[in-house]
A protein has these predicted regions:
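Sec-dependent bacterial lipoprotein signal peptides
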Residues: 1-21
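Aromatic- and Gly/Pro-enriched helix-to-coil junctions and flexible linker segments
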Residues: 21-167
């Protein structure tokens, strides 16, 4: 009598579990609430110069891919270093950054940039998480301020300009 009871128990368990394991809705969408796209125009030149080279994030072989003058180009035949970064490339880099960790990005933006270290982008740039390029910013330096002020919705244009020439 134990066997039929066990079969009934397993069948009931599976019947309850199967709906929970249903495939995701293919029509579902996620709204990305990234930092202001227009102000990214001030941040992008620093990221392109420091992070977007072919040996770093300017390649298709990285999870975070950046497009622009120093690395990957969107237009066929446009080679690195040959022409300025296009607006389409800035858009693609913005989308790549915002979509890397969409839920965390949404939370950081909703919190007006509080605790930006929740983002892998910030942790790796600061060197608090393993990064092949090492630490590229120090907390509070102009490079860090450029990124974190953008995440907070108050892009520090002066810091972003200084980040381009910061040693």
């Amino acid at each position: 009598m134990t066997l039929p009871f066990a079969k009934r128990t397993i069948a009931a368990f599976l019947a309850a579990a199967i709906p929970a394991c249903a495939a995701p809705d293919p029509n579902a969408t996620t709204t990305l609430a990234g930092p202001d796209r227009a102000s990214f125009d001030s941040v992008q030149p620093f990221l392109d110069h420091r992070c977007g080279t072919l040996d770093c994030h300017g390649t298709r072989y990285r999870n975070l891919r950046l497009w622009g003058h120093d690395g990957m180009r969107l237009a066929f035949g446009d080679v690195p270093g040959a022409s300025p970064t296009t607006s389409a490339e800035v858009d693609a880099s913005y989308a790549a950054i915002v979509a890397l960790e969409p839920e965390i990005m949404n939370a950081v933006v909703a919190d007006h940039g509080a605790h930006p270290e929740r983002l892998t982008l910030v942790r790796k740039a600061r060197g608090t998480e393993k990064h092949a390029g090492g630490a590229i910013v120090a907390v509070g330096d102009v490079r860090d301020v450029c990124i974190t002020s953008w995440l907070a919705g108050q892009t520090d244009e002066t810091a972003c300009a200084a980040a381009l020439v910061y040693p």
